[in-house]
Swiss-Prot record:
Annotated membrane topology: Single-pass type I membrane protein
Keywords: Disulfide bond, Immunoglobulin domain, Membrane, Repeat, Signal, Transmembrane, Transmembrane helix
Boundaries of every Ig-like V-type domain copy: 22-141, 146-257
Subcellular location: Membrane
Signal peptide per UniProt: 1-21
GO terms of molecular function: RNA binding
Protein name per its UniProtKB record: V-set and immunoglobulin domain-containing protein 8
Domain of life: Eukaryota
InterPro entries named among the record's database cross-references: Ig-like_dom, Ig-like_dom_sf, Ig-like_fold, Ig_sub, Ig_sub2, Ig_V-set, V-set/Ig_domain
Bilayer-crossing regions: 264-284
Record organism: Homo sapiens (Human)
Lineage, broadest ranks: Eukaryota, Metazoa, Chordata, Craniata, Vertebrata
Record gene name: VSIG8
Length: 414
């Protein structure tokens, strides 16, 4: 009993000394993820017990602790001693760090760190010394925000095809997470659930696969594959690239064209063009057939031996190519009595007379019997229709030979 009572008395006597200490308010360790270029306040508020007020001075130190155990060292970059503020041995921090309070001895040893750089990533420790010492650590991780990503699509946006939505950020501290969201257009339960998932990209992928197989991850983290697309997939899709300190977005549009409808339209157009082509060919064939018969006859008539009414044929047809004895005269459709021999025979008068002169020139004097040219008038020939025309050659008398060439009348020998 005496031993226990003595030990209890000792604890009572020593308790004021054990309780008198510097205490820093807040958690013992804090972890911060900060963006490059930001400003941050590293807190270190402290309190002193009444027993701590004494002749001993107050010392405050801020140091950067290397987390690598092999190179563990402490670099004091800011301190307060003997009521003076001192900058330490880190030049890259001297212009960017200061105490938050003008007088750190007033129970606040917090500091402001400005324009953070990725190289500022480290563990920062605050130490407050009086009769005793208290410490507090803050782990600072400085990262670059994701760069503005690029969004684009690969694949033909036609009904039933597969389309890949691509998203890529060229800058930003790793790890980067990619998420897609449909921000306009048709929304369906399985689409909305997968797009609005708050999980990271990889866990979101398994969440999608459990609902619908048409959404898959591509070869890269920022790829989203839409399989067997339809008009229900039309809309704007937003890609969000994020890390611990920020995010950036880009938007791409999906507009599916119905290839079946396009095929029907193309078929209708081609069918219409084919029908018009066939109609044009048919009309051209009919025109050629009609013009071919009349043209051939006209061509023959132009030379005086066709059945049609050619230029040279006039109203007469089926004229022989040359005049023979006992040849049948062609039919004549002369309109009046004034028709000339050209309309009877189908030849111009001068040509007939020249032909008769050459072919039926009078025989030499004293030749065979006399031949007379049978008279024929245009009116008689036209009224009677085709009739034989006989050409008789009359032998010239000796007196005629003496007188000269036989006289002609109206292009015929008389």
């Amino acid at each position: 009993m005496r031993v226990g009572g003595a030990f209890h008395l000792l604890l009572v006597c020593l308790s004021p000394a054990l309780l008198s200490a510097v205490r820093i308010n807040g958690d013992g360790q804090e972890v911060l993820y900060l963006a490059e270029g930001d400003n941050v306040r590293l807190g270190c508020p402290y309190v002193l017990d009444p027993e701590d007020y004494g002749p001993n001075g107050l010392d405050i130190e801020w140091m950067q602790v290397n987390s690598d155990p092999a190179h563990h060292r402490e670099n004091v970059f800011l301190s307060y001693q003997d009521k003076r503020i001192n900058h330490g041995s880190l030049p890259h921090l001297q212009q960017r760090v200061r105490f938050a309070a003008s007088d750190p001895s007033q129970y606040d040893a917090s500091i402001n760190l400005m324009n953070l750089q990725v190289s500022d990533t480290a563990t920062y420790e605050c130490r407050v010394k009086k009769t005793t010492m208290a410490t507090r650590k803050v782990i600072v991780t400085v990262q670059a925000r994701p760069a503005v990503p690029m969004c684009w699509t690969e694949g033909h946006m036609t009904y039933g095809n597969d389309v890949v939505l691509k998203c890529y950020a060229s800058g930003g501290s790793q790890p980067l997470s990619y998420k897609w969201a449909k921000i306009s257009g048709h929304h369906y339960p399985y689409r909305a659930g997968s797009y609005t998932s708050q999980h990271s990209y990889h866990s979101e992928l398994s969440y999608q696969e459990s609902f619908h197989s048409s959404i898959n991850q591509g070869l890269n983290n920022g790829d989203l594959v839409l399989k067997d697309i339809s008009r229900a997939d039309d809309g704007l899709y937003q890609c969000t690239v994020a890390n611990n300190v920020g995010y950036s977005v880009c938007v791409v549009e999906v507009k599916v064209s119905d290839s079946r409808r396009i095929g029907v339209i193309i078929g209708i157009v081609l069918g219409s063009l084919l029908a018009l082509g066939c109609l044009a060919v048919g009309i051209w064939g009919l025109v050629c057939c009609c013009c071919g018969g009349s043209g051939a006859g006209g061509a023959r008539g132009a030379f005086g031996y066709g059945n049609g009414g050619g230029v040279g044929g006039g109203a007469c047809g089926d004229l022989a190519s040359e005049i023979r004895e006992d040849a049948v005269a062609p039919g004549c459709k002369a309109s009046g009595r004034g028709s000339r021999v050209t309309h009877l025979l189908g030849y111009p008068t001068q040509n007939v007379s020249r032909s008769l002169r050459r072919k039926y020139a009078p025989p030499p004097c004293g030749g065979p019997e006399d031949v007379a040219l049978a008279p024929c008038t245009a009116a008689a020939a036209c009224e009677a229709g085709p009739s034989p025309v006989y050409v008789k050659v009359k032998s010239a008398e000796p007196a005629d030979c003496a007188e000269g060439p036989v006289q002609c009348k109206n292009g015929l020998l008389v």
